[in-house]
Amino acid sequence: MKISKILLSAMAAVAVFASCAEQEVTVSVVPQPASIKAAGSGVAIAPVPVIDCQSLELQVLGQTFVEVAGGIALPNFTLSIDPKLEKEEYTLDSRKGSVKIAGGSEAGVWWGLQTALQIIYQSEDTFPGLVISDKPAFAYRGAMFDCCRHFFTIDQVKEFIDMVNLHKVNVLHWHLTEDQGWRPEIKSLPRLTEIGSVRKETLVGHYGSNTYDGTPHGGFYTQEEMKDIVAYAAARQMTVIPEIEMPGHASAALTAYPELGCKGKGYYVQTTWGVFDEIFCAGNPGTLKFFKKVLDEICEIFPSEYIHIGGDEAPRAEWEKCPKCQALMKEMGYTSEAQLQSYIVNNIEKYLNEKGRKIIGWDEILEGGVTQSATVMSWRGTDGGIAAAKMGNDVIMSPTTYFYLDYYQTADPEANNEPLAIGGCLPLEKCYEFDPFDGLNADEQHHIKGIQANLWTEYIPTYEQVEHMELPRIAALAEISWSNASKPEYPVFVENIEKALLPIYTARGYNFSPYAFEK
């Protein structure tokens, strides 16, 4: 039974149309729906449209959509839940009367609304008559945002959420701790943000330049601010997964609490980039106590099923020399320092499991052995993910070769006036070539739970550059993670972006990269 209606004031309408008379679909959607057919006469885009909702929850969802739409003119909508559909599945029927969107849950309805938004931007005074049936290939469609190498405000994190959410991304992996800055407030460990959140200066130019700006850089997120981000994302059907690095990338934390390092002194918040020997002491009982304190508070803020525990780029040179670490190895019968990392990971996983949570870690966590319940995020190519899937572990594919969006976007960045980046060359077309199932048989493919694009910010000091590096490459992540085997050919995909997304990028003022569209 319909119990609520939303009356909306509207300001303006935009762009192209679909010819229903010919029953030909001439609108584009990214990612491309599983089924889209032209039918009926369509729905007028009204100055004062109505959103007819089946429940109060859908009424709130409709109000959020109006906010995200940003004041453009809209057609009438009818929103409902269809329990026969899968959670993120939706149908859209705009043959007459209203744009009727049914989802298997609020998430399904939301993705239907995002599809409708792209179509509205291609319409003039009528939303075309269409029948759409659609659902994602993968349940995890992620975007990682590093807010440690450079700090970004809460408002900018919200802008990031809206930007990737437009592409049906449903996970924000929030990278919160690093050598160059600790960002989350932990009330029981106040020095983490009092000391660890600020570095005295930042490298200028590429790694090895030995030139610094002489300006302190830092910032942190209060617990209330982080809860605000969680709520903001949830209203847009996104989950926020926090990352707390362990045992490496520890310089900022050890500057605040040096007694937790193997050396016990001499630490500082790093001012340059790279991998550092500073590491939490595996043989110090205080290390696990520290992480448990941190995670107690993190779990109160973030309700996500998963907590990311890092695990990448953890040099073991200090463990090799540390009497406490060597004593622990002898006690446990270990033959490799890699097992010390597994000791930390497995203890933390058990602790989080007791709280009803699961862990994700970068693929290095495989090196000393992991439990079957750990999810592996494969970043050093796909080999780690393939190995994990063959072992029966769940996997998120996030390879540098396809989805490290801090890489340059053209082969000649200087000639193309690209902003300074870490290196490499990752154009949109290369992203689009990724096959998440390559090297796996049908049974092993079931362990690939999703795909993620990562944005590391060593060379991204401004939010405008964040947009430039994400757009339009995040659309490739969206198309593969949503459509996968049914994705369109690359030229069609680019044309779809031009029709369906560029008008929205332009209207929102996004600083998108133009290279893929230059003829």
PLM regions: where:
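Flexible loop/turn segments at secondary-structure boundaries
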Residues: 151-153, 179-185, 247-253, 308, ...
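Active-site neighborhood of glycoside hydrolase catalytic domains
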Residues: 253-259, 268-374, 379-390
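Feature activates predominantly on carbohydrate-active enzymes
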Residues: 23, 85-278, 282-306, 347, ...
